[in-house]
Amino acid sequence: MNIINIFIPDLPESVTDATIIKWHKKKGDKVQEDTILVDIETDKVILEIPSPSDGILNSIIADKGKIVLPGQVIGTLLKIGIKNEEKIIKTTNNVVNTDNNQNINLKLLEKTYSPTVRRLISMHDLRDVDIIQGTGTKNRLTRKDILNYLKNIRSNTNKKINNYDLNAYNFNTTHKNHRSIKRVKMTRLRKKISERLLSTKNNTASLTTFNEVNMQSILNLRRKYGELFKQKHGIKLGLMSFYVKAVIEALKIFPEINASIDNDEIIYYNYFDISIAISTPRGLVTPVLKNADLMSMAEIEIKIKDFSEKGKNSKLTIDDLIGGNFTITNGGVFGSLFSTPLINPPQSAILGMHAIHKRPVIVDENIEVHPMMYLALSYDHRLIDGKESVGFLLKIKEFLEDFSRIVLNI
């Protein structure tokens, strides 16, 4: 029989530690090689650690909630032969059962009260509950015991209380149940989001400029070619691919926005990695479309859908999230009409797209109804001036209102 250590794997350079969030197996469980043993959470993603071999989980050294480092041993695996396997399993099960019995016996010795009893004790500030004789199972205090005790006290002080009052008391205090609170420990991702957002507010000269765009042209294109697009590429023609293409062309014209500040230097990027804000059950993440300028609209739609699915299932990788020179966030999918998005550091700008609503607009001195959308560009004023930010947003407006300009490169 061999004892095999279960290690935390090497983490990316930007990640220093991780948190144990779930053990899928318990001590004594038989596992096969590559069976997922435990999930760990970094600042960016959830990683799964598989079993290094067939065997039995011998020990769990780092429990749920523990912070662990790369190379740290978090448990051990018992690698055994087939003949000894059944014996070990039986022995392990016996140990587990013994522990369970011991826990049960200890719990039986504890003085425990039901929520109703605890509530009555608290409401009446009863400090001598030990003198009350319990009539419940194993002499546990019941609601009736407390009420009878209160009745006797009040009788002794000539304060009458009848059965109706006692019964009504319980109903009159049920509203207390609606004033409960719940504390939940923040996940590493939520803490990281909090830190980054606070850092953005404190360390950037953030400013937001706005515009609006007539989406009629884009909607007409989707209506006309949407079905053909889906038949050929197997993916729905969404709005994000139009937004990404418009952003890339605008970034080519305004390199200051495709840049970042590093101490007293400005880094200009000659490539276009676009971060896409995606909502997941764990929080907001921004996976990156690498070299988005080289991607077709179908490839963009497929990649964004893949990011969304991986985000829902906590399968995004470190590589998916690293990098990004500019972020697009689409609050319109949740119905947001207007917002001031926060910059995603170390980037210098973020574009907020919003819900499309029909509004009356003036076209050639006539009032017409068109599908309109507000645009919001938040930018770091230390690097980007008003002229560049407004010009950038105007270019996006032009490209979206006449998408053929991108095709013709004009």
From Swiss-Prot:
<feature type="domain" description="Lipoyl-binding">
    <location>
        <begin position="3"/>
        <end position="81"/>
    </location>
</feature>
<dbReference type="Pfam" id="PF00364">
    <property type="entry name" value="Biotin_lipoyl"/>
</dbReference>
<dbReference type="InterPro" id="IPR006255">
    <property type="entry name" value="SucB"/>
</dbReference>
<keyword id="KW-0012">Acyltransferase</keyword>
<dbReference type="GO" id="GO:0004149">
    <property type="term" value="F:dihydrolipoyllysine-residue succinyltransferase activity"/>
</dbReference>
<dbReference type="GO" id="GO:0005829">
    <property type="term" value="C:cytosol"/>
</dbReference>
<dbReference type="GO" id="GO:0045252">
    <property type="term" value="C:oxoglutarate dehydrogenase complex"/>
</dbReference>
<feature type="modified residue" description="N6-lipoyllysine">
    <location>
        <position position="44"/>
    </location>
</feature>
<feature type="domain" description="Peripheral subunit-binding (PSBD)">
    <location>
        <begin position="112"/>
        <end position="150"/>
    </location>
</feature>
<dbReference type="Pfam" id="PF00198">
    <property type="entry name" value="2-oxoacid_dh"/>
</dbReference>
<dbReference type="InterPro" id="IPR023213">
    <property type="entry name" value="CAT-like_dom_sf"/>
</dbReference>
<keyword id="KW-0450">Lipoyl</keyword>
<comment type="subunit">
    <text>Forms a 24-polypeptide structural core with octahedral symmetry. Part of the 2-oxoglutarate dehydrogenase (OGDH) complex composed of E1 (2-oxoglutarate dehydrogenase), E2 (dihydrolipoamide succinyltransferase) and E3 (dihydrolipoamide dehydrogenase); the complex contains multiple copies of the three enzymatic components (E1, E2 and E3).</text>
</comment>
<comment type="similarity">
    <text>Belongs to the 2-oxoacid dehydrogenase family.</text>
</comment>
<protein>
    <recommendedName>
        <fullName>Dihydrolipoyllysine-residue succinyltransferase component of 2-oxoglutarate dehydrogenase complex</fullName>
        <ecNumber>2.3.1.61</ecNumber>
    </recommendedName>
</protein>
<dbReference type="GO" id="GO:0033512">
    <property type="term" value="P:L-lysine catabolic process to acetyl-CoA via saccharopine"/>
</dbReference>
<dbReference type="InterPro" id="IPR050537">
    <property type="entry name" value="2-oxoacid_dehydrogenase"/>
</dbReference>
<dbReference type="InterPro" id="IPR004167">
    <property type="entry name" value="PSBD"/>
</dbReference>
<keyword id="KW-0816">Tricarboxylic acid cycle</keyword>
<feature type="active site">
    <location>
        <position position="381"/>
    </location>
</feature>
<dbReference type="InterPro" id="IPR036625">
    <property type="entry name" value="E3-bd_dom_sf"/>
</dbReference>
<comment type="function">
    <text>E2 component of the 2-oxoglutarate dehydrogenase (OGDH) complex which catalyzes the second step in the conversion of 2-oxoglutarate to succinyl-CoA and CO(2).</text>
</comment>
<keyword id="KW-0808">Transferase</keyword>
<dbReference type="GO" id="GO:0006099">
    <property type="term" value="P:tricarboxylic acid cycle"/>
</dbReference>
<dbReference type="InterPro" id="IPR000089">
    <property type="entry name" value="Biotin_lipoyl"/>
</dbReference>
<feature type="active site">
    <location>
        <position position="385"/>
    </location>
</feature>
<dbReference type="InterPro" id="IPR001078">
    <property type="entry name" value="2-oxoacid_DH_actylTfrase"/>
</dbReference>
<comment type="pathway">
    <text>Amino-acid degradation; L-lysine degradation via saccharopine pathway; glutaryl-CoA from L-lysine: step 6/6.</text>
</comment>
<dbReference type="InterPro" id="IPR003016">
    <property type="entry name" value="2-oxoA_DH_lipoyl-BS"/>
</dbReference>
<dbReference type="InterPro" id="IPR011053">
    <property type="entry name" value="Single_hybrid_motif"/>
</dbReference>
